[in-house]
């Protein structure tokens, strides 16, 4: 059965005229360092636990078709302290009981259907799709979703899709219909399959995407403006750089001109940020981000401090030492030479999960 899991109590989260592009610089009432506008009331990055929906069988609920659960199919020891779970079983949600006949994906393209494995005339396609759309609205406060691997309702990828022609081989490129419906209604929502979360890099990346999404929701609730969108990016730029230099550059281009388009650009920025953070942050990515942060600080460092930091970053790049060592060296330098811009970087809070 696995360790006990925290199941959350549901609680909600908290067309403009054309204007000149937002230019970063000194503004009355705002502290400024580098290219970051430091506003004292900027929403803080949420601390765990954060609300996350999850396939109910993964929490120990005996809701699978045969009356079993899948509690051991999740690395819960590393997740229980970070997430508050909202368990959902779409099959139970549409009125299928336990035990029940298993369901399967059949067909191709727009004709994809979900039917009973015992009776192909029992079609739950529309019911699962509608349930997904409804849950996307009901679960407005969630900041991520953990789906059951290869499930015809919940799988994100590699789900078996059977041909409606008897004897034809099945494909393994399907997506669960409930998951597809819900995620289409919640673009940007971090989602991952349970089995992939046993990979430490995937697990850490997912945790950070969830926390980032939660931070974004706070920003939206507080009111998205051009200045706040730029400040949000400024705080995440080195974390995004560590994960994907391509997405880092794309995000910068998106924010180069926000005239009267903050809401529209904000949606595109979130998609770019989530896609970028979904890329693995390798040693070279970390070393690149750390080197850029060193470049921001280097004029204040002594020759000895510079040598120590450069050597630590190079050991990170080559794998001779963990990323945390180089990060610690940079934090020591920041303690001796405080810098508001680097001190506001999300990278330092995120790297503990990577």
PLM segments and residue spans:
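Acidic, Ser/Pro/Thr-rich low-complexity regulatory regions
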Residues: 190-354
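Glycine-rich anion/phosphate-binding loops
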Residues: 120-139
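Compositionally biased, low-complexity flexible segments
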Residues: 1-30
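Internal, conserved structured core segments that host functional sites
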Residues: 137-219
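Short N-terminal binding/cap micro-motifs at the start of the first secondary-structure element
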Residues: 59-67
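Short beta-strand segments
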Residues: 55-56, 89, 146-150
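Short catalytic helix/loop segments, enriched in acidic residues and glycine
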Residues: 68-85
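Short, surface-exposed acidic-centric catalytic microdomains
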Residues: 87-111
